[in-house]
């Protein structure tokens, strides 16, 4: 029998931490929290007009970028903060805006030399001698040819010749997260939470940017990543009438409740009540209704595997279900995930309509269709890929959820990431040794394989740090993290073999990857074999006497030994030992 392996175990369903844009302890990570920049009030202005702000450390005065100034007699009707400042230059007025908390833009008058520091959204009008500009002309964090036009607007659109004005307007409204500026009609549109699902690349004449000014730390990619973690959760007073999967439990936060849903293979969405702190896991499509204190969200907010502008055309032969009043494509994905016949979904922005489709959809594919979003039934950070779904449907292959697609030598097998959670998934399991940088995911995996006790690893693509881990994975969300098994070798795993009715050891455990079940079994001293059920994502950890409960030709299951395949173990040898 196997040797004793002392490991501290924490099951996935007990996790409560999730990253929502706030720095938290993370297994040895050196955290660099995202903190909005600010400027203190400046104490002096040089005769030349340069800003000597409290945060300027250089001996040379700071040079202000004034490239976004409306120099064509433009003022702003927006409220002025405090009293106008007299007898200053344009440069000094720009510096004054930067020094005043809450200033989003300013108006300077060439004739009167008066400076009006403004708050709120720029409201431009013709003013003799007027020059108006955003708090910052830095556009380094804007992205060209990127559009979020399909996302719902949270503010009235604004017409301006300067894209920097769009950022000033967005910064003034707490509901705005990002803006999109169209150079052709000089119009800004403003988008709120959930915007990331509507991203389109390659749109000529369009620029998008974050609400936070670039020179104060604004990053569009950061906003996107945070939106894909929590942007689709209902803000307040929205519950779900869908039946609960189990008795509700207390949770520390809405993030902790979401994490419980992520760890349960049956869960499609959840409801958390801010007043009672109770967490309700749901296993069917959302049935939203008004409920005081409730906040409801899907298993995942990640929309990175969706495609915008693609349509499969409605067809009774492939349409399984049509649902109206669906406000976001993520909610459409939940409906698809809850329907066993669904392979992909199609969401129409103008009608708030969700159509879920079965196999055979690909032959109706069209591109360049405005206002339509499509995606796979699998949540993006759980391996969902619309491209893989399309390829499988085009050749008439089996459903991508069955066990064949999870095994080596299958057509869609990619050994680099087959056993890796790529969607901002970290592990809180104990880190082995010193945390060091790695040049790639592969190097981090090799480092894990060089450590005798390493069962899995976490690699952060942003910092390049590699964390070899021991014991059972303890998954949670963390930006940039990827977590994988020690090896992607699945040669000793067997499809269709089921030991799930054998003597279970440890607590129920869930994962979307069968290789994680092997890691969990290896970490559980009494576990000899595991069975993974693809339909529920449940890992059955089975102990001595398992061989008497073997069943063959069971659809959707994968079984394997507790030791990794590249160590030479196999089920046949273990079964022989088990019957001795």
From Swiss-Prot:
Q: Where is the signal peptide?
A: 1-25
Q: What is the protein name for this chain?
A: Micronemal protein 4
Please list the disulfide bridges.
68-137, 93-115, 97-103, 141-214, 166-188, 170-176, 232-301, 257-279, 261-267, 305-380, 332-354, 336-342, 419-488, 444-466, 448-454
The answer to whether the entry has keyword Nucleus is no
Q: Which Gene3D superfamilies match?
A: Hepatocyte Growth Factor (3.50.4.10)
Assembly description: Monomer. Part of the MIC6-MIC1-MIC4 complex. Interacts (via the second apple domain) directly with MIC1 (via the beta-finger region). Interacts with murine TLR2; the interaction promotes activation of bone marrow-derived dendritic cells and macrophages in the host. Interacts with murine TLR4; the interaction promotes activation of bone marrow-derived dendritic cells and macrophages in the host.
Q: Which GO terms describe its biological process?
A: cell adhesion; effector-mediated perturbation of host innate immune response by symbiont; effector-mediated suppression of host innate immune response; immune system process; proteolysis; symbiont-mediated perturbation of host receptor-mediated signal transduction
One term of GO molecular function: Toll-like receptor 4 binding
> Which UniProt keywords are present, listed alphabetically?
Cell adhesion, Cytoplasmic vesicle, Disulfide bond, Host endosome, Immunity, Lectin, Repeat, Signal, Virulence
| Source organism of the structure | Toxoplasma gondii
Q: Which domain of life is it from?
A: Eukaryota
Q: What this chain does, per the record?
A: Soluble adhesin with carbohydrate-binding activity. Binds to galactose-terminating oligosaccharides. Required for attachment of the parasite to the host cell prior to invasion. Triggers the activation of murine bone marrow-derived dendritic cells and macrophages and production of pro-inflammatory cytokines, such as IL12 (IL12B/IL12A), in host TLR2/TLR4-dependent manner. Triggers the production of anti-inflammatory cytokine IL10 in murine bone marrow-derived macrophages in host TLR4-dependent manner.
Reproduce the free-text note on domains from the UniProt record: The first and second apple domains are sufficient for targeting the protein to the micronemes.
Summarize what activates or inhibits it.
Lacto-N-biose inhibits binding to asialofetuin, a host glycoprotein.
Apple domain ranges (all copies) = 68-137, 141-214, 232-301, 305-375, 419-488, 492-565
Which InterPro entries does this one have?
Apple, Pan_app
Where does it sit, as one GO cellular component term? extracellular region
Q: Does the keyword Signal apply?
A: yes
**Classification lineage:** Eukaryota, Sar, Alveolata, Apicomplexa, Conoidasida
PTM note says:
Proteolytically cleaved at the N- and C-terminus after release from the microneme.
Null phenotype? Answer: Reduced production of IL12 in host cells during infection.
Subcellular localization? Cytoplasmic vesicle, Secretory vesicle, Microneme; Host early endosome
- Pfam name, any one: PAN_1
């Amino acid at each position: 029998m196997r040797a004793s392996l002392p490991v501290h175990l924490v099951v996935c369903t007990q996790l409560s931490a999730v990253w929502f844009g706030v720095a938290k302890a993370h297994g040895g990570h050196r955290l660099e929290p995202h903190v909005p920049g600010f400027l203190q009030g400046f104490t002096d202005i040089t005769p030349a007009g340069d800003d000597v702000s409290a945060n300027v450390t250089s001996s040379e005065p700071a040079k202000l970028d004034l490239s976004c100034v409306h120099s064509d007699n433009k003022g702003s009707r927006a409220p002025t903060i405090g009293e106008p400042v007299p007898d200053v230059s344009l440069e000094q007025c720009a510096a004054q805006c930067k020094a005043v908390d809450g200033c989003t833009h300013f108006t300077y008058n060439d004739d009167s030399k008066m400076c009006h520091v403004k708050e709120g959204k720029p409201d431009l009008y013709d003013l003799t001698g007027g020059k108006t500009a955003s708090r910052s002309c830095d556009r380094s964090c804007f992205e060209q040819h990127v559009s979020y036009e399909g996302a719902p607007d949270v503010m009235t659109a604004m017409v301006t010749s300067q894209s920097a004005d769009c950022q000033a307007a967005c910064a003034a409204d707490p509901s705005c997260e990002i803006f999109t500026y169209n150079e052709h009609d000089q119009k800004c549109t403003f988008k709120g939470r959930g915007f990331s699902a509507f991203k389109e690349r390659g749109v000529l004449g369009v620029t998008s940017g974050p609400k936070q000014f670039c020179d104060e730390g604004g990053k569009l990619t950061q906003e996107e990543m945070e939106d894909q973690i929590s942007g689709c959760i209902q803000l307040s007073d929205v519950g779900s009438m869908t039946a609960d999967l189990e008795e509700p439990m207390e949770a520390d936060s809405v993030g902790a409740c979401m994490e419980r849903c992520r760890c349960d293979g049956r869960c499609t969405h959840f409801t958390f009540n801010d007043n009672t702190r109770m967490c309700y896991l749901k296993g069917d499509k959302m049935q939203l209704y008004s409920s005081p204190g409730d906040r409801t969200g899907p298993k995942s907010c990640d929309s990175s595997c969706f495609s915008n502008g693609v349509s499969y055309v409605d067809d009774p032969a492939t349409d399984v279900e049509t649902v109206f009043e669906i406000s976001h494509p993520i909610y459409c994905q939940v409906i698809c995930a809850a329907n066993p016949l669904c392979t992909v979904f199609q969401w129409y922005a103008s009608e708030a309509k969700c159509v879920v489709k079965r196999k055979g959809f690909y032959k109706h594919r069209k591109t360049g269709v405005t206002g339509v979003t499509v995606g796979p039934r699998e949540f993006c950070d759980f391996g969902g890929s619309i491209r893989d779904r399309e390829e499988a449907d085009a050749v008439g292959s089996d459903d991508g959820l069955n066990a064949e697609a999870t095994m080596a030598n299958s057509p869609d097998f990619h050994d680099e990431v087959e056993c890796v959670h790529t969607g901002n998934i970290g592990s809180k399991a104990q880190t082995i040794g010193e945390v060091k940088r790695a040049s790639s995911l592969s190097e981090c995996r090799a480092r894990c394989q060089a450590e005798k006790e390493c069962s899995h690893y976490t690699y952060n693509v942003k910092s390049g740090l590699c964390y070899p881990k021991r014991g059972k994975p303890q998954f949670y969300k963390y930006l940039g993290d990827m977590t994988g098994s020690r090896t992607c070798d699945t040669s000793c795993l067997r499809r269709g073999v089921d030991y799930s009715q054998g003597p279970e050891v440890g607590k129920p455990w869930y994962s979307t990857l069968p290789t994680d079940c092997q890691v969990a079994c290896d970490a559980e001293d009494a576990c000899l074999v595991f069975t993974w059920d693809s339909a529920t994502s449940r890992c059955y950890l089975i102990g001595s006497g398992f061989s008497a409960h073997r069943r063959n030709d069971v659809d959707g299951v994968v079984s394997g030994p507790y030791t990794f395949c590249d160590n030479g173990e196999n089920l046949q040898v273990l079964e022989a030992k088990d019957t001795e």
